[in-house]
Regions:
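Hydrolase active-site cap/lid region
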Residues: 149-200, 206, 250
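Gly/Ala-rich beta-loop-alpha elbow adjacent to hydrolase catalytic centers
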Residues: 138-143, 147
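An N-terminal hydrophobic leader/cap segment in hydrolases
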Residues: 8-42, 48-56
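Short beta-strand/loop motif that positions the catalytic acidic residue
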Residues: 203-205, 209-212, 216
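Membrane-embedded segments
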Residues: 48-125, 145
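Acidic catalytic loop of the alpha/beta-hydrolase fold
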Residues: 214-219, 246-247
Length: 272
């Protein structure tokens, strides 16, 4: 027993922060494309880097709505800002994409616990600038997690999430068996409760579009469906048949997403 206790203490010590190291992988370099603007926000003595771009419909007129997008775990804002902004096509929408703390020009450590306050601070600054205009939140994979957190804690006009993980559940149920939960347990415990997507989905009331890849091996569909089933607001679920985690939408998927984004925009701007 005396020999076991030090071994357990050593394991728990080395396991501290392992959730951050296993989940977050900040890329070293990224270049933003044309038409992209860079902003920095000050929050709690740290810098949050945000990249913004406008949809084709907002190039020559002010935006009627805004979208706050969150990236995946191996992605920076520069990688996706032009693409996600362009998806709104003729709808006049300005998109903001945040670099998480420790990513790009955002200061602070790349830790899960640093993501929720940065997400809310960015939303609050966007709300200050947007005034009464609607704000959507969006994210793919890990990005869906802070998107749902914001949707549960701030007024948003709509939510778009793709391949959403239920991180704690997935760590526990998918990975616990092969290490007798000796690694899975501390990793699951280190995921902040603010990033419990199932709990946040239950509190989110805005209309949502949820895309599920039914052959996803990174976030198996049963965990994605757990988030989708928990979502409290009105929702449209788009199942991508035969799609993996990184699969691009096929023509049918694009058409369904386009229709769903029209639905969100029209609802948010009706009478505006």
């Amino acid at each position: 027993m005396r020999a076991i206790v030090p071994a357990v203490l050593i394991f728990l010590t080395t396991a501290t922060g392992c959730a951050d190291r296993l989940i977050l992988h900040p890329p070293a370099n990224a270049i933003a494309g044309p038409g992209v603007q860079r902003r920095t926000l000050a929050h709690d003595g740290k810098t949050i880097e945000v990249f913004t771009a406008r949809s084709p419909g907002a190039k020559n007129a002010g935006p009627r709505a805004f979208m706050l997008e969150f990236t995946g775990n191996m992605t920076r804002a520069e990688h996706i800002i032009a693409y996600v902004a362009s998806r709104w096509e003729e709808h006049p929408v300005e998109t903001w994409v945040i670099n998480y703390p420790g990513y790009g020009g955002s200061s602070g450590g790349a830790t899960l616990r640093n993501i929720p306050p940065a997400a809310l601070a960015t939303y609050d600054e966007l709300r200050r600038l947007a005034g009464e205009r609607p704000i959507f939140v969006a994210g793919q994979s890990l990005g869906s997690v802070p998107a749902l957190y914001v949707a549960a804690n701030r007024p948003v006009a709509g939510v778009i999430i793709q391949n959403p993980p239920a991180i704690r559940d997935q760590v526990w149920h998918q990975h616990g068996w092969w290490n007798l939960w000796l690694l899975a347990a501390p990793v699951a415990w280190q995921v902040p409760r603010e990033l419990d997507s199932v709990a946040n989905a239950k509190r989110a009331a805005a209309p949502a579009v949820i895309l599920i890849a039914d052959r996803d091996r990174v976030v198996p569909p049963r965990f994605q469906r757990k988030v989708a089933d928990a979502y409290a607001g009105e929702k449209r679920v788009i199942v991508q048949e035969g799609a993996g985690h990184e699969s691009h939408l096929d023509d049918a998927g694009h058409a369904k997403l386009r229709d769903a984004m029209d639905w969100l925009f029209d609802r948010a701007t009706a009478g505006g």
